[in-house]
Amino acid sequence: MAIRPGEASGRASGRTALETIGLGKRYGRRWALRDCTFRLPAGRICALAGPPGAGTSTLLSLASGLLRPTEGTVRVCGESGPAGRARVAHVTQGKPLYPRLTVAETLRLGRELNPGRWNDRCAEQIVRDGGLSLGARAGVLPEGQRTVLAFALAFAREPELLLLDDPLDGLDPLDRHRIAALLLARSAERATTVVLSSQALAELDGICDYLLVLGGGRVRLAGEADDVVGMHTLVMGERRGEGLPREIAAHTVIDTQLSGRHFTALVRRKGPLAPGPWEAAEPSLEELLLGYLRAPGAPGLIAPSAEPVSSRRPHRPGGRPGIPGMPRNGRPGTAGVPGGTPHTSYHHHSGKGAAA
């Protein structure tokens, strides 16, 4: 994927925007997030995905300081505690706003609550470009304009890390397109790192260049989007027995979809895929995410780009630095996910990668 304008300096410096080590949050006896370890380099737009209850909202709240961790650490731009939280803006689910305040009053309140860290020009331009009336009350704004106002409050703080919890939820296709364009343009201006949680997987493909997938409160998949997608192949063909052909089963099979006599399999390659009576293609970002979401027992993957620097073991002759138990360079591993088998579902459909 192309590097956004203004992003190159953040990438070249190797800076880290968000890093967690063994992060966990427990409510009573239930762990909402457990053993969460990853690194997000600066300047990325990261897709955060997971099924309901996966821990995505919990992770964002821990990163912004809304929640305290039960265990582990979280650092923003190398800082923990108040110093790290000062670098974050967080748009939570539902985009809560004071309904009786006008747009102008909402922006004024934002300025008063963020002394010394507020860009009036940025806030006003976002509101103006979004077609909002300064006299309109926040409580009567349509959903798309509520999102624009929430983004104005967030970007006006000039955060280094912007956390967005399902901001596209409830928007019509036109509003989603407008909000995505706003996000890309504004984050590019200051090379703001963005973590975007969304259930609209198709929308993430043209926005995000980094992936983080949670499942069961644990990290399932993390790394540069191009690298992670490139490690996988979508294979489609006709079944000639009960299972997959052995040439395909020899790789790490993440997810298999069966329709009549045909199969579609998402595999993480261990090497070159042998030729055969099947078609092979690189999966789209949506197909990759769907495969991992449908297969909670399949081996996870933490790419080298997502390994926290502070937890890497010293290099030893004959070995590679990394995190114990996590795969390196695309090799199979559990990445903290209990062992299990790849997911297979039976349904009637035509077309590759359809959801079960």
What is each PLM-predicted segment?
Residues A49-P51:
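The feature captures the beta-strand-to-loop junction immediately N-terminal to the Walker
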Residues S64:
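Helix-to-loop junction immediately C-terminal to a conserved catalytic motif
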Residues E71-G84:
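Conserved ABC transporter NBD signature motif
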Residues G94-L149:
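ABC-family P-loop ATPase nucleotide-binding domains
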Residues L162-D166:
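Catalytic Walker B motif of ABC-type/P-loop ATPase nucleotide-binding domains
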Residues H177-V267:
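ABC transporter nucleotide-binding domain
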